UniProtKB/Swiss-Prot annotation:
Entry GO terms, CC: helical viral capsid
Residues recorded with modification N-acetylalanine: A2
GO molecular function, one term: structural molecule activity
Protein name listed in UniProt: Capsid protein
Keyword Zinc: no
Superkingdom: Viruses
Record carries keyword Acetylation: yes
UniProt cross-references to SUPFAM superfamilies, sorted A to Z: TMV-like viral coat proteins
The encoding gene: CP
Protein family according to the UniProt entry: Belongs to the virgaviridae capsid protein family.
Localization annotation: Virion
InterPro entries reported in the protein's UniProt record: TMV-like_coat (IPR001337), TMV-like_coat_sf (IPR036417)
Organism expressing this protein natively: Cucumber green mottle mosaic virus (strain watermelon W)
Function per UniProt: Capsid protein self-assembles to form rod-shaped virions about 18 nm in diameter with a central canal enclosing the viral genomic RNA.
Swiss-Prot/TrEMBL keywords: Acetylation, Capsid protein, Helical capsid protein, Virion
Amino acid sequence: MAYNPITPSKLIAFSASYVPVRTLLNFLVASQGTAFQTQAGRDSFRESLSALPSSVVDINSRFPDAGFYAFLNGPVLRPIFVSLLSSTDTRNRVIEVVDPSNPTTAESLNAVKRTDDASTAARAEIDNLIESISKGFDVYDRASFEAAFSVVWSEATTSKA
């Protein structure tokens, strides 16, 4: 039993890029209260978000029969997901100073602005992700997955001699 036909352009569909929709939405809604002002808050959020995707389908393992899954490598969700991860990846870039032991007032103010910008960007991308998923972009069940990627599940056949 396997999916057919498989071409290089379809291999991304079989990657560990799926999250159950309810799990992802619950995580995103709960994350709206996250303290993105601290590096620890951004790190914790990014690590938790990065741990959500998993592999639910393989060339030899059929897409789950029940439930809806967000495909984070899809054409709509991928740029939002990557932007969200990037907005939380500010370690060692928030404060860029000439003399690290004695930052100037301007350098400190710039660091605060960068932190605020990262927080604003993260919150905006969380909202964008929730909205896109709610509209059904890159969200699949078995039938829509097989139709979207033009693959057919072929049952094993036995030959009679």
